Curated annotation (Swiss-Prot):
PANTHER family: 30S RIBOSOMAL PROTEIN S16, SMALL RIBOSOMAL SUBUNIT PROTEIN BS16M. The keyword Iron-sulfur does not apply. InterPro entries: Ribosomal_bS16, Ribosomal_bS16_dom_sf. GO terms for cellular component: cytoplasm; small ribosomal subunit. It comes from the Bacteria. The keyword Ribosomal protein applies. Belongs to the bacterial ribosomal protein bS16 family. One of its GO terms (molecular function) is structural constituent of ribosome. This is Small ribosomal subunit protein bS16. It holds the Pfam family Ribosomal_S16. It comes from Pseudoalteromonas translucida (strain TAC 125). Keywords: Ribonucleoprotein, Ribosomal protein. One of its GO terms (biological process) is translation. The gene is rpsP.
Length: 82
């Protein structure tokens, strides 16, 4: 099953997440199909906290992809901000 979820990057104690479309059988930080954005939970000042390619997310959801709980909340927030 294809899912849209977070892929962790960054340094210890300083997380940075890529938002990726991946098969649910692949490991969290492993192979993915497409990168559709990023999420920086510790952004400060004028730094961009989230960037999301909403048309691609809509495309994948239309193809049957499911959203992880956290990504669903991020998509909702991104739609509200747009």
């Amino acid at each position: 099953m294809v899912t849209i979820r977070l892929q962790r990057g960054g340094a210890k104690k300083r997380p940075f997440y890529q938002i990726v479309v991946a098969d649910s059988r692949f490991s969290r930080d492993g192979r993915f199909i497409e990168k559709v954005g990023f999420f920086n939970p510790i952004a400060a000042g004028q730094e961009e906290k989230i960037r999301l390619d909403l048309p691609r997310v809509e495309h994948w959801v239309g193809q049957g992809a499911s959203l992880s709980d956290r990504v669903a909340k991020l998509v909702k927030d991104a739609r509200k901000a747009a």
